[in-house]
Amino acid sequence: MLLLILLFFKGLVCHEKSIVGPQPLGWHHPAEAEEPLIFRLLHIASFKNHSWSHSQASAWIGDLQTHGWNSTMGTIQFLKPWSQGDFSKEELKNFEALFRLYFHDFPREVHAFAHQFQFEYPFELQISGGCKNVGKTSENFLNGAYQGSDLLSFQRSSWEPSPGAGSRAQKVCEVLSYYKDITEIVQSLLSSVCPRFLSGLIAAGKSELERQVKPEVWLSRGPSPGRGRLQLVCHVSGFHPKPVWVMWMKGQQEQKGTKTGDIPNADETWYLQATLDVAEREATGLSCRVKHSSLGGHDIIIHWGGYSILLILMYVAVIVTLVTLIVMGSWHRKQSSNRNVLSSYISNPTFPLENDTQCPRSSALQLHSAQESWIKNRILKWKRSLNQFW
């Protein structure tokens, strides 16, 4: 079976070369990219016992997933309109057949060599391979892991055991090195096919890959880490691409206790928060600084003021509401007074009675007093509600 796979691999690579022919690689990089984009294939295989296994596979360019694998149908899932790059339908069909054979027979070969490789059930294997284009050259990689620990890597046309991986890694590398065709095929896929496919992906998905979205930044308090201490949280949300630099600062000095963690948003932007635990008396003068490619070199700096953004927004809402009520009350009093005065003149335009001229003023005063009392009651109620946040 292994020989059959090798022959298929070799035929596929040779066929791919005959279709494409020798041609210079076209290198396309986003103008704003800080680092070269990496194309990466990930394969995770779980082995519960001698007869059960499960595989998951995906492909990524940078932090954006571009492909998946439907294990039921044995087909490639193209997750973006440009996921085919500049490969022809025939090339993609051939590679789909290649992966179908690989995912079908890889578990069999692992089961067959499990005892020799000292794999103990249940176990998991992780394989990561890909490339990146740097200027007019390319760099490639392939790494294997056993139970989450580094096992081996493919470097300069040879299989190398990872430092500290022991005799298990040595045995796996010996078997892989014995089959020279495996080394030749892997080398061709990594050094020739992968860079060309990556170049086509970058060109086809240029608008999405170069998308720049500025982050929104705000500060808040986190759960208290202890008496007399504060947890300061800097929220950075909605930015793209993913690379971002966030740090709590005091003046120009970085606060080394800063802890960060990021998660993706549904719109393929990112959210990150940076936390810092400090003594309450040391919070004065702290600020959160954010650097991102979308900002054009103009960093965002938010100074810690001791109040959460929620409380600030509540105060703003209260002030706006109060101003609105006062303006509306004043306008209503004026309109009511004008209507009453006009009514008195219409009823007796020549000789207005004394009590008629005084009545509108009396009504206006009563209305003003009632509205003023209502506004005062509302203000007292809001004040009691706000006191709960202190």
From Swiss-Prot:
Propeptide: 15-33
GO MF term list: endogenous lipid antigen binding; exogenous lipid antigen binding; lipopeptide binding
UniProt signal peptide: 1-14
Residues carrying sugar: N49, N70
S-S pairs: C131-C194, C234-C288
UniProt-listed CDD domains: IgC1_CD1 (cd21029)
Keywords: Adaptive immunity, Disulfide bond, Endosome, Glycoprotein, Golgi apparatus, Immunity, Immunoglobulin domain, Lipid-binding, Lysosome, Membrane, Signal, Transmembrane, Transmembrane helix, Ubl conjugation
TM region positions: 305-325
PROSITE patterns, per the entry: IG_LIKE
Superkingdom, taxonomy of origin: Eukaryota
Matching Pfam families: C1-set, MHC_I_3
GO terms for cellular component: early endosome; external side of plasma membrane; extracellular space; Golgi membrane; late endosome; lysosomal lumen
Domain Ig-like residues, every copy: 215-306
PTM annotation: Mono-ubiquitinated. Proteolytically cleaved in endosomes to yield a soluble form.
One Gene Ontology biological process: positive regulation of T cell mediated cytotoxicity
Protein function: T-cell surface glycoprotein CD1e, soluble is required for the presentation of glycolipid antigens on the cell surface. The membrane-associated form is not active.
Subunit structure as annotated in this protein's UniProt entry: Heterodimer with B2M (beta-2-microglobulin). The association with B2M appears to be facilitated by the presence of the propeptide.
Protein name, UniProt field: T-cell surface glycoprotein CD1e, membrane-associated
Organism: Cavia porcellus (Guinea pig)
Record gene name: CD1E
